[in-house]
Amino acid sequence: MITTQSISDIRKQVTAWRLKGETVAFVPTMGNLHLGHITLVKEAKTRADHVVASIFVNPMQFGQNEDLDAYPRTLADDQAALIEAGAELLFTPTPDIIYPKGMDAQTFVEVPSISDELCGASRPGHFRGVATIVCKLFNIVQPDIAVFGQKDFQQLLVIRTMVEDLSMPIEIVGIETIRETSGLAMSSRNGYLTTEQKDQASQIKRTLNNMALSLKAGLLIKDVVAKAQAELVHVGFRNDYLDVRNANTFAIATAADKDLVILVAAYMGSTRLIDNLVVKLAY
């Protein structure tokens, strides 16, 4: 696997593959890779001739009081994992390479409406940072396919919308959330949890499952949400949001909707965890 910080090196290699009529899949990450990331790379390998990955801890998507400096940097381990998974090219730019004029002078991409709700409301500017870096990386790599995890459901929808609105010729593939044996969604931030907190955090998935059963049984959405919020508080969470949306439009769900997604963000100690569950009701 070739590792480079150079935009021109990335473009030269991708161009060489293109001249042979070969396809390229892309998996952008912030590093500190776990099995969820590796699953994305392996899936990408089945969908294209070549896989490009990136590792960039994007300062634009972190808020003032968030953990940018504390975010783990584990490049050597990440490289070994990517090689084993089948990636052939790794882009590891620095902030100076991505934002040479500084972030305040950087042209940005913002997807309206979706970016301002839930995680966007809790983390103002977060999705502008996500959309901007993903747009830049897409322009640098120019992949045929890009693979993302569904754990970040709202982020995936933001990226799909950006690609559609800007007429980017890229297929966006979402992969089902990879979980630990306890049911806890795999996340780089799980490393911040103590053993006891990880055990408590596994309640998120059980709560989502209980909500799905209640919704399928025809209970009112507001009652299902209220009960679930209480469950999470009982095991030690501080709720950020818990909501049920239309899985296709992201509008607040109504009794008439059949394709739903339950989305949750909650704090265990100082660590913010997110998860979701898609629920299909009978027509």
Curated annotation (Swiss-Prot):
Single GO term (MF): ATP binding
| Protein residues bound to beta-alanine | Q61
List of catalytic residues: H37
CDD domains (UniProt xref): PanC
Q: What else is known?
A: The reaction proceeds by a bi uni uni bi ping pong mechanism.
**Function, in words:** Catalyzes the condensation of pantoate with beta-alanine in an ATP-dependent reaction via a pantoyl-adenylate intermediate.
Question: How does it associate, per the subunit comment?
Answer: Homodimer.
What is the name of the protein in this document?
Pantothenate synthetase
Species assigned in the record: Shewanella pealeana (strain ATCC 700345 / ANG-SQ1)
What is the gene name?
panC
